Design a protein with these regions (language model features):
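Metal-dependent phosphoester/phosphodiester hydrolase catalytic core
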Residues: 2-575
Length: 575
């Protein structure tokens, strides 16, 4: 695409003072006729500056929506005709490109209710984040983008109900940990066919390792696109590689997503400005800035989350009528360094230091303020790492993960104390990170099995990380025996589907028999339910995956914390 420098300058000047036509504040301040008038100038602009020409289909990374409100949602795409171009620009020129967008009541776009235009530029990898406003609460909509003569795939999204509005039911799924090399994204194909209002992603969307550095017990089945990543072009290309999977694109296009990160979006086990591996703090902060920018460029996030160098505001709330409120946490960016080196360690003074925090003081205050004001039936903490206490060694000598909330007892005690003292209604924690399914009751005192149960934690397995899993083994059952507040374990891949009503919160553990080959069926391994006003989960259904006729038995292993940490440490040594 050849664009005259003068016209490019005039084009930018014309639209920078308006902001973007898609910005909700501007869209609300002008009439639909004014929008139609400005969009009517688009053919003239294209004749003046040239219709963009792409070397290949520019919407190769698909479309997505996220962070829904009662009157709007964020729409996302990125122009990338050559998504793995070495310079990280996706095959795009250095100039800006107009991208039109439409929102309609119907999939055929006969009833378009909102439309607008964004200017996509190289500073954000030609990504587009449209904050659409003026929509109706609790409604499905269809959306698409246009650039030049090219049209994107159609996405489907949904707004949330009006604040305080009565809601009979909500359905959402949560997922995490999708190491590309460890397996195929079959789970996302099944998820895209579910009837959901929302998807919550709890982190480890990408992995930073080079080719075959982190090897699954069942073997790696795909290859990363290059060595371990450090620079902005490398992080951009890693997201592009993961988005090359059609099942992941389908799940993004099917529902609005609410995303947060864990560690592998930057580097394994980092803590605030402290790298998880070697290197100086300055080097790590440069790397973190590149990683955060690439994350924003590839997620349906609002402009309030635009990174400022190595800092990015990710915590936020999503309220679903009077039924549920989601407090989306960031437990990486503000935490103290992991105690005792950050591995599996016995109790220690650093772990017990009440001043240490996994959320940071400001985010903890924000959480308490939100929980204290909430009038929702279900109060959900969407976060990354295992929240409940989990002694990982049988016998009298305890061992805990210092990277999880077990390494930050002060933070956990303050949250559980606040929930108990303030009588927060129906707290439920959803977590990822550990590549296995767990269910745990949250106790006022984990060392006293008879102490008050104050909440519930549902921990979801990985999409692929760890490779083919297995239902359970002796060591996993030993952990359950050592921790009487833990009710369930499963070591297979998949996601968790949740159904909320005013009376109950049900979590269905949806699992696959394998991810090392394509085409695995989905199965509900277990269903657990929390009743309104009665903290703690009860199993209400599910059974092990039955034998699959005609499918050879696939050798599988369970990757518990020790194996996972060892494999990732080996990956760090390899790199």
């Amino acid at each position: 695409m050849n664009i005259s420098g003068n016209w490019e300058k005039r084009r930018i000047e014309t639209f920078e003072h308006l902001g973007s036509i898609g910005r909700s504040a501007f869209a609300r301040s002008i009439s639909n006729k004014a929008v139609e008038f400005i969009l009517g100038l688009f053919p003239l602009l294209e004749r003046l500056v040239g219709v963009p020409r792409f070397s290949d289909y520019p919407f190769s990374l698909g479309v997505a929506s996220g962070d829904p409100l009662p009157d709007g949602v964020v729409l996302w795409t990125r122009l990338a005709p050559e998504p793995l171009a070495e310079d990280g620009r996706g095959g795009m020129p250095s100039g800006r490109v107009f991208v039109r967008w439409e929102v309609a009541d119907d999939e055929g776009f006969r009833r378009v209710v909102r439309r607008g235009m964004e200017s996509a530029g190289p500073e954000m990898a030609h990504s587009v984040h449209v904050e659409v406003g003026g929509l109706q609460p609790n409604r499905h909509y269809f959306y698409r983008f246009k650039a030049g003569s090219e049209i994107s795939p159609v996405g489907r999204t949904k707004t949330v109900p009006a604040p305080g509005g009565a809601v009979a039911q909500m359905r959402f799924a949560f997922a995490s940990c999708q190491m590309y090399e460890h397996g195929y994204y079959t789970a996302y194909g099944h998820m895209s066919e579910e009837d959901l209002d929302l998807v919550v992603h709890l982190g480890d969307y990408i992995y930073e390792y080079g080719i075959n550095e982190y090897i699954a017990s069942s073997g790696n089945v795909r290859r990363h696109d290059g060595p371990k990543i450090f620079t902005l072009p490398q992080y951009r290309n890693r997201y592009a590689l993961y988005r090359s999977a059609s099942n992941l694109r389908a799940a993004h296009a099917a529902f609005p997503w609410v995303v947060t990160w864990d560690d592998h979006e930057v580097e394994n086990n980092y803590a605030d400005g402290i790298p998880g591996g070697t290197g100086s703090v300055d080097e790590f902060l440069r790397r973190r800035a590149a990683a955060y920018q690439a994350y924003y460029e590839h997620m349906p996030l609002r402009r309030s989350s635009v990174p400022q160098g190595p800092d990015m505001l990710l915590r936020r709330r999503i309220t679903y009528g009077n039924l549920a409120e989601f407090n989306v946490l960031d437990t990486r960016q503000y935490r103290n360094d992991q105690a005792a080196g950050g591995g599996l360690d016995p109790p220690n003074p650093e772990q017990r230091d009440p001043s240490r925090t996994i959320t940071g003081k400001a985010q903890e205050r924000w959480l308490f303020e939100g929980l204290g004001r909430s009038r929702s039936r279900w109060n959900v903490l969407a976060q990354q790492v295992f929240f409940a206490q989990r002694d990982l060694r049988s016998g009298p000598n305890e061992v805990f993960s210092m990277d999880a909330w077990d390494g930050y007892l002060g933070s956990r005690n303050r949250i559980l104390g606040f929930i108990t003292e303030r009588g927060i209604r129906n707290p439920v924690v959803i977590s990822g990170d550990v590549h296995n399914n767990w269910v745990a009751n949250l106790k006022a005192d984990f060392d006293d099995p008879d102490s008050l149960t104050v909440g519930t934690e549902f921990v979801g397995t990985s999409i692929t990380s760890g490779g083919d899993g297995a239902d359970t083994n002796r060591r996993a059952q030993g952990i359950i025996a050592e921790n009487p507040h833990i009710q369930f374990f499963n070591g297979q891949r998949g996601y968790v589907r949740c159904v909320l009503t005013p009376e109950s919160f049900r979590a269905d553990y949806r699992v696959l028999p394998f991810v090392s080959r394509r085409g695995a069926p989905i199965h509900t391994r277990a269903s657990f339910e929390v009743s309104d006003g009665q903290p703690g989960a009860q199993q209400v259904g599910g059974e092990p995956i039955p034998a699959i006729p005609g499918v050879d038995r696939i050798p599988a292993a369970i990757e518990l914390d020790g194996e996972r940490i060892e494999a990732q440490q080996r990956a760090n040594r390899e790199s």
